[in-house]
């Protein structure tokens, strides 16, 4: 046996001894987390100041009535965020419990010895919270037999987790399959969390559970368990805007359900300043520029004009062009959003296959720039698998391409999307759009939304046969612009700290500033929504 193998064997044996890992963590390791774990030194350093800020908070912060809340966190960055959020909710007068798991990575196994050391490390680090917040470590919650409906839901989540991790929809889950080991790991982890949340919610009268994301990993397990029991689940995430968060109640926030907002505000005409704001945002997105509190550049290069794009791609101006904009395969904004295909990759393959037999048309596949960060099943490969000899009328624009998507939109006769917001923007420009996934703007009145493959292909043929140069009716374009304004400017909730820039945002807006009489009122509606109070979308 190698030295490494012997060490692992010893750790496995010691990991089964009561209190051995905890004693090692306290005495031999000097409180340092295991190499396989994670450290939260920044959180440890600022916790005393955060607690003092909460104690100093004035009566203006209290939100009546106080509610009982369970806040959940997993992975180091979300645990840091969950602690800060729990303290804000405590300052607002709520009774808060914080549940978490101690695993460093969602895709790697952790032996019992290191896991128990990490648990001991977190328990010690978070101990100062216990005077105000009850802590629950769900890392090794005993797994009972799950209710059949919840078990079925968790099995669906397990598969989504593997797709998310592998960044591909097609999985090898046969005996000995390369994805089966990961599926087994995700199954155990999700059931530990589900079991712990089930026990807590059945044993206490919680008003709401507050969960990041809610669509994947342990976050999805907590969400699905809360909904199984009928307990209000509040999910939250962060997009491209600073000082804003996305928030949903009794839904996965990544589905971005705008139904309540659209019902309350969809009929309101845009004011002149609102029209200008959406026009300026669109111009910035096209030009690859930062704008307002949007912290992302949407294009790697500014617009060079439609003519330059046509010439660089060799497109024929006499034949209709369909612009297909992909999602990132395996992204949580696209997983589980299928309507009439098995997923985004299946839809892309079916669409490419159809266009391969229709040379009287042209298809431009604009691959999402996010694939530059990695893709288990790249969109370009999906196209090649369907059309190994790529015909001239099917063009793939790779994620690293400097070709500006908005230049391609000027050339497009038809837009094809799964869930990306580019479809909404094409409709704003008068381009008919067909949606294939359950995107938030599906059914809002400015896109074609087929519910079956035959209906999709019929819509394709009909739209492509329309005269070149035709555009959507002005009232439909106006509807798309109204929706886009509501989505970009009114759907996000005001909040001081973005997850990606958490520590920088905290330096700019520390606890005392957020809890001050001057700033707290602008965040109070978000805090009420996070606590599970119904959102009044009629208030702009």
Feature-to-residue mapping (PLM):
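Conserved N-terminal ligand/cofactor-binding loop architecture of enzyme catalytic domains
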Residues: 2-68, 91-191, 238-302, 504-505, ...
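A short, glycine/small-residue-rich beta-strand->loop->alpha-helix junction that serves as a flexible
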Residues: 72-82, 211, 333-336
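Histidine-anchored nucleotide/phosphate-binding helix
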Residues: 76-98, 102, 223, 343-356
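Conserved nucleotide-sugar donor-interacting segment of glycosyltransferase catalytic cores
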Residues: 192-248
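A donor-sugar binding/catalytic signature common to diverse glycosyltransferases
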Residues: 244, 401-448
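Nucleotide-sugar donor-binding patch of glycosyltransferase catalytic domains
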Residues: 247, 434-479
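Conserved catalytic-core segment of nucleotide-activated headgroup transferases in glycan assembly
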Residues: 287-385
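Nucleotide-activated donor-binding/catalytic signature segment of Leloir-type glycosyltransferases, i.e.
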Residues: 380-399
């Amino acid at each position: 046996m190698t030295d490494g193998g012997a060490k692992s064997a010893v750790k496995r044996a010691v990991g089964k001894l009561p209190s051995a890992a905890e004693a090692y963590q306290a005495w031999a390791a000097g409180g340092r987390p295991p190499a396989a774990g994670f450290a939260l030194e920044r959180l440890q350093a600022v916790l005393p100041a955060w607690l003092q800020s909460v104690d100093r908070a004035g009566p203006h912060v209290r939100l009546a009535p106080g509610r009982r809340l369970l806040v959940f966190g997993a992975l180091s960055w979300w645990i840091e965020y969950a602690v800060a959020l729990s303290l804000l909710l405590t300052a607002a007068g709520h009774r808060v419990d914080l549940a978490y798991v101690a695993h460093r990575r969602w895709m790697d196994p952790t032996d019992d010895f290191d896991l128990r050391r990490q648990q001991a490390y977190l328990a010690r680090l978070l101990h100062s919270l216990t005077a105000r917040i009850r802590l629950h470590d769900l890392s090794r919650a005993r797994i009972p037999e799950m209710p059949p409906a919840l078990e079925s839901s968790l099995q669906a989540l397990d598969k989504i987790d593997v797709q998310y991790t592998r960044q591909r929809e097609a999985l090898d889950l046969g005996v000995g399959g390369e994805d089966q080991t990961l599926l087994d790991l995700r199954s155990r982890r999700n059931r530990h969390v589900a079991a712990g949340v089930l026990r807590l919610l059945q044993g206490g009268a919680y008003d709401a559970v507050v969960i990041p994301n809610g669509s994947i990993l342990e976050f999805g397990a907590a969400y699905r368990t809360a909904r199984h029991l009928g307990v209000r689940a509040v999910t939250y995430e962060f997009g491209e805007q600073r000082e804003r968060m996305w928030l949903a109640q009794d839904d996965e926030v990544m589905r971005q359900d705008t139904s309540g907002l659209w019902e309350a505000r969809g009929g309101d005409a845009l004011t002149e300043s609102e029209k200008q704001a959406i026009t300026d945002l669109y111009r910035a997105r096209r030009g690859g520029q930062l704008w307002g509190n949007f912290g992302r550049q949407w294009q790697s290069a500014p617009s060079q004009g439609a003519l330059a794009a046509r010439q660089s791609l060799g497109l024929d101006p006499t034949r209709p062009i369909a612009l297909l904009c992909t999602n990132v395969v395996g992204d949580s904004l696209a997983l589980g959003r299928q309507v009439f295909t098995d997923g985004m990759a299946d839809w892309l393959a079916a669409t490419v296959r159809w266009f391969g037999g229709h040379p009287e048309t042209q298809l431009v596949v604009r691959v999402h720039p996010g694939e530059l960060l990695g893709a288990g099943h790249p969109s370009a490969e999906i196209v090649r698998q369907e059309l190994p000899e790529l015909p001239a009328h099917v063009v793939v624009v790779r994620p690293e391409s400097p070709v500006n998507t908005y230049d391609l939109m000027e050339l497009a006769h038809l837009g094809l999307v799964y869930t990306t917001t580019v479809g909404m923007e094409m409709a704003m420009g008068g381009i008919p759009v067909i949606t294939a996934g359950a995107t938030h703007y599906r059914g809002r009145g400015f896109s074609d939304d087929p519910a079956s493959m035959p209906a999709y292909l019929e819509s394709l043929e009909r739209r492509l046969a329309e005269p070149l140069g035709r555009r959507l009716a002005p009232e439909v374009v106006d509807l798309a612009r109204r929706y886009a304004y509501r989505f970009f400017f009114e759907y996000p909730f005001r909040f001081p700290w973005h997850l990606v820039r958490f520590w920088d945002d905290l330096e700019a807006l520390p606890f005392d500033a957020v809890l001050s009489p001057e700033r707290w009122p602008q965040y109070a509606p978000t805090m009420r929504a996070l606590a599970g109070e119904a959102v009044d979308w009629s208030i702009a």
